[in-house]
Swiss-Prot record:
Its biological purpose: Specifically methylates the cytosine at position 967 (m5C967) of 16S rRNA.
Designated gene of the protein: rsmB
Known catalytic reactions: cytidine(967) in 16S rRNA + S-adenosyl-L-methionine = 5-methylcytidine(967) in 16S rRNA + S-adenosyl-L-homocysteine + H(+)
EC nos: 2.1.1.176
Primary localization: cytoplasm
Example of a GO cellular component annotation carried by this entry: cytosol
InterPro entries in the cross-refs: MeTrfase_RsmB-F_NOP2_cat, MeTrfase_RsmB-F_NOP2_dom, NusB-like_sf, NusB_RsmB_TIM44, RCMT, rRNA_ssu_MeTfrase_B, RsmB-like_ferredoxin, RsmB/NOL1/NOP2-like_CS
Superkingdom field: Bacteria
Enzyme class, spelled out: transferase
UniProt-listed GO biological process terms: regulation of DNA-templated transcription; rRNA base methylation
Binding site for S-adenosyl-L-methionine: C251, C252, A253, P254, G255, G256, K257, D275, D301, D320
Localization per Swiss-Prot or TrEMBL: Cytoplasm
Name by which UniProt lists this protein: Ribosomal RNA small subunit methyltransferase B
Amino acid sequence: MNPRLAAAKALAAVLSGKASLNSSLPTQLDKVELRDRGLTQDLAFGTARWQPRLSALAAKLLQKPFKAADADVEALLLVGLYQLFYSRIPAHAAIGETVGCADKLKKPWAKGLLNAVLRNAQRDGEALLIELEHDPVVRTAHPRWLQKALKAAWPEQWEAICAANNAHPPMILRVNRRHQRRDQYLELLKTAGLEASACTFSQDGIVLAEPCDVRSLPGFAEGWISVQDEAAQLAADLLELAPGQRVLDACCAPGGKTCHLLEVQPQLSGVVAVDLEAKRLVRVRENLERLGLDAELIAADARETAQWWDGKPFQRILLDAPCSATGVIRRHPDIKLTRQLDDIAALATLQGELLDALWPTLQVGGMLVYATCSTLPTENTDVIEAFLARTSGARELDIAGQAGQPPAGIKQPHGRQLLAQQGGHDGFYYAKLIKIAAQDRGGAGVTS
């Protein structure tokens, strides 16, 4: 299959609200020649990254919008526009190859439309984009609801956040403390001809100058390192793990943090890792096996503790709560297409429900770290404020820096917010809570 058609089919599923790129793209990649898979991924992710801008340009060039049933043609047009303005593919090849894919859609009218619109874009597109620059949706390539939400939350930083969201993300590694010191592994990378440097905030983190195939990394198969963003690496040390503790990792997939907990403290009494869907735990199990680690994996709704909790308290809980993922848009640019404003309030409700449900499983004196990869206060500091207001036995702890560094991110009314940095960490939020008393049914705290 032509990589342009494969990318368009994956994007059409996203535009139709039927899938994310993570679920729709692998199916299409299987239909593409191995040598074309990199191009297919670039076309799919690149088009999603710039979709708000490309769709605005398409609207200027089209006489009328596409019908919902023609999402495949719309996606193919966007892929064509992406090639013209954001790739090194020669214009004649971008237009010719994209128009040629129209035959496979079995819509006779599509070929002429695509040819005309793409040629007009080649001639007039740059001028039209300049015309459209006054609209912040076009300028930032973010949907209006998100652009407004970021501006309201971060009036001084919102444009930098958008720019970071549109940049290609760095490849960041986490060194397995059980096998290597970071300085040792940096030397191994140097010997292998891979340029890299130590991360600022994570004492296990290494950022590569250029992404590479994991199979070229020394000791990857042996479990010496994993791929994980620096911001996500901070969770394990924030928990202040000690030997003999029982730890819950709630909403654990794909398991990067689960594994890091076990690397940081090999003498835990056990880790229970819960996720909603059994199929998501497959990846967790694969990561554990590669690293030679063990955890109890449970497929369940973490809120329904009666279904999975054995009644034995946890001394530490990591709640990596489901969220809008607005801090990792650069890694998942289709979030711009799949998320809506209404989702945020619903997610905040879910996050509060998870906190309420898991808090009784935490031992008095135990610690819970709440984490999201969102940059929106509604899902972060506001959720913690509401939880503290209704939970008398909970207190917030300050977040300190690691390895002699100041704490990452920006102090919030509750917790700390990391904003995505070009060439650095993703957007992330952390809050740290301690249980000073149990909660009776009337809501009062009782020590025990």
